[in-house]
Amino acid sequence: MIYTVTFNPSLDYIIDVEHIKLGLVNRTVREIIYPGGKGINVSIVLKNLGFDSTALGFLAGFTGADIRTRLETMGVKSDFIEVSDGMSRINMKIRSDEETEINGMGPAIGSADIDKLYDKLDKLKEGDVLVLAGSIPSVMPGTMYSDIMKRLEGRGIDIAVDATRDLLMNVLPYHPFVIKPNNHELGEIFDVELRTRDEVIPYAKKLQEKGARNVIVSMAGEGAVMVAEDGTEYKSEAPKGKVVNSVGAGDSMVAGFIAGYLSTKDYEQAFRMGVCTGSASAFSEQLATKAEVDALLAATYK
């Protein structure tokens, strides 16, 4: 079974406004609302690709109830923990002459809530896959993901981590199955600027030396690279298409890689699946569908 964890789920509210004017009443010309959060995005894309998962995390208030309902409508299973203090956040993206994002705070997650999450994670079994994705609330320690991995260490659970900075670096001693920084995040870790696939590879290997089994680095229009646990290096140009909405593209890459690996047990095929799934989401207003991914696979890797 696949499980995803999202510490701070959201309702993502995207509005289009023609020539927004601050300080005045503006009217939208288009609105979209959908459940958000990196782990949730992974679960949605996995479902689109034909793989069931269970979305874990924390919900609160009427917004939390709406997130749960929307996921149920999509056919995504969930087992969220209800938090009593606050409400799940609303993240607003205003698209006009420029794009502006306003992100909500989210509920107050206490130690008792964390213990409930641990209780759920303790039930995972050998062969399960766990995805830890996204940021955590600022009140939580930067060891949150590594604490989870330490707790599950030695149980045969493959753990994917999509996080940044300390949250990512702290998990490396526990040998995550796959990590997926982008080239900018990777550069920030080592205080360098990484622009090309060849420049990225040595630094991806440094993360592998620190403990990661497989390292994928996404590079938007420059494609992606992967260093597999057997030492093989894979490089891919970006699939051709027009970027419509890049939100969720990285999460989609993680979902595609997991789906590809579970289907084939082949790292090259899984990497290609990840690349095309990420691009398919970027080329669409919504998250990638299987038909979109299959079309990109056929067009990109002839």
Regions found by a protein language model. Give the residues of each.
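Conserved phosphate/ATP/ADP-binding segment of small-molecule kinases
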Residues: 142-230
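Conserved phosphate-binding/catalytic region of the ribokinase-like
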Residues: 197-302
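Hydrophobic alpha-helical segments and helix pairs
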Residues: 108-123, 127-152, 158
